[in-house]
């Protein structure tokens, strides 16, 4: 499997509007999509998703921070990549499935970090929301 590039990182936040202000006003990211509980920002060639995780108990807030890191791979490499993950008995969380204009699979690395392989582009994903 050949990784074409970094696709995006999703960060779970406690207050979407506060975080959106920080990433836009302080870091200078451009807002490209705003949903009910998530936003997508662009920063040069980097793409960042902020996903709100509301919780009243302290335990509920333990999941804040990086949710997953996604890498772009070629469509023609996707099935082989999925097969390799299965052969090595990697824990698959979601997928493989069609999502946001591409094919996607989410899985865990040996330390439990969630990773994603995605065949689409930011532009293809944005078309889904138009």
Which sequence ranges carry the predicted segments?
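N-terminal beta-strand motif that seeds the catalytic metal site of vicinal oxygen chelate
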Residues: 1-17, 69, 121-130
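Conserved short beta-strand elements that form part of the metal-binding/catalytic scaffold
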Residues: 30-63, 114-120
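Amphipathic alpha-helical segments
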Residues: 17-30
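Vicinal oxygen chelate
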Residues: 6-13, 42, 60-130, ...
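Short secondary-structure junctions
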Residues: 28-33, 92-95
């Amino acid at each position: 499997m050949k990784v074409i590039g970094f696709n995006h990182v999703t960060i779970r936040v406690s207050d979407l509007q506060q975080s959106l202000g920080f990433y836009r006003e302080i870091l200078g990211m451009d807002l490209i999509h705003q949903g009910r509980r998530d936003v997508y920002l662009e920063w040069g060639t980097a793409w960042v998703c902020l996903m709100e995780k509301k919780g009243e108990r302290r335990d509920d807030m333990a999941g804040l921070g990086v949710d997953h890191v996604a890498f772009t791979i070629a469509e023609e490499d996707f099935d082989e990549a999925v097969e390799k993950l299965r052969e090595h008995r990697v824990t698959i969380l979601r997928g493989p499935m069609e999502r946001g204009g591409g094919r996607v699979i989410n899985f865990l690395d040996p330390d439990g970090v969630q990773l994603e392989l995605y065949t689409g582009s930011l532009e293809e994903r944005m078309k889904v929301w138009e």
